[in-house]
Amino acid sequence: MDWIKETFGTHKPIIAMCHVRALPGDPYFDADGGMEKVVDMARQEFLALQEGGVDAVMFSNEFSLPYLTKVEPVTTACMARVVGELKSEIKIPFGVNMLWDPYASLDLAAATGAKFIREIMSGVYASDYGLWDTDPGAIVRHQMRLGLKNVKLLWNIVPEAAKYLADRPIEQIAKTTVFNNKPDVICVSGITAGAATDTDVLARVKNAIPTTAVFANTGCKLETIEKILGIADGAVVGTTFKKDGLFDNHVELDRVKAFMDKVHSIR
């Protein structure tokens, strides 16, 4: 897992989420504020994350609710504009995530130069979005066709708002996912953004695949990050950086700094 330190400059990295507000075509897009407001808000939140000392950032269309499993082209185009307008200000490694579409995530990575993506790329799930099917072979072939062999894949095997259809132990899912798909990172999530990752499940996954990186994907807090990083190889963190730790609120610099001070004290 030497690539983790090479990519993020540290072991056990904290990847901060920059949750982009609703975009054109999304039901809750602010048409009065327009894309200019979306970009301005993304810039404010990104700069707070970067100044707060996070190791990397991941831009996602987090407010494109309700989510699609096949993202519309306008959404990817608007996300490319957001990242493109911020690109000159980005001084840390960054990734992208188009919820919930790995193909669109790869397309956005190709457009922006992102170093990693995160998505659901294997398994079949009963979810809030309907029956959720995947095709990892086609996804990885799309990655290679786009010339993105160096883009790291953060592979979520416990997706939010969904349950694996087959009655298989999580250890078995982790092992076969690694064997069949060679993911760079396995992500373990809670039930929604901001919901705690079950540390027992996290430990079971890590014990099952000790030579593969495992990241906690949701719900990391100042009070829990020490325990989480005692198990995981890194964490994706978003909601806890926001005012009062609430999903709908905006990132606060002081919360980011306090969290990262804690991380620096334990790693």
Each predicted region: which residue ranges?
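Alpha-helix-loop-beta-strand connector modules within alpha/beta enzyme cores
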Residues: 10-11, 16-17, 68-96, 134-154, ...
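Short beta-strand segments at enzyme active-site cores
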Residues: 14-17, 53-66, 94-98, 119, ...
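Conserved, mostly hydrophobic/aromatic
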Residues: 16, 49, 57, 117, ...
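Active-site mouth loops of central-metabolism enzymes
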Residues: 19-44, 94-101, 155-171, 216-221
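Conserved anion-binding
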Residues: 20-23, 104, 108-184
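Glycine-rich, proline-tolerant flexible connector loops at the mouths of alpha/beta enzymes
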Residues: 53-78, 124-129, 183-196, 243-246
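Catalytic cores of alpha/beta
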Residues: 96, 101-114, 172-173, 205-237
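Alpha/beta catalytic cores of nucleotide-metabolism and tRNA/nucleoside-modifying enzymes
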Residues: 141-142, 161, 221-226, 232-267
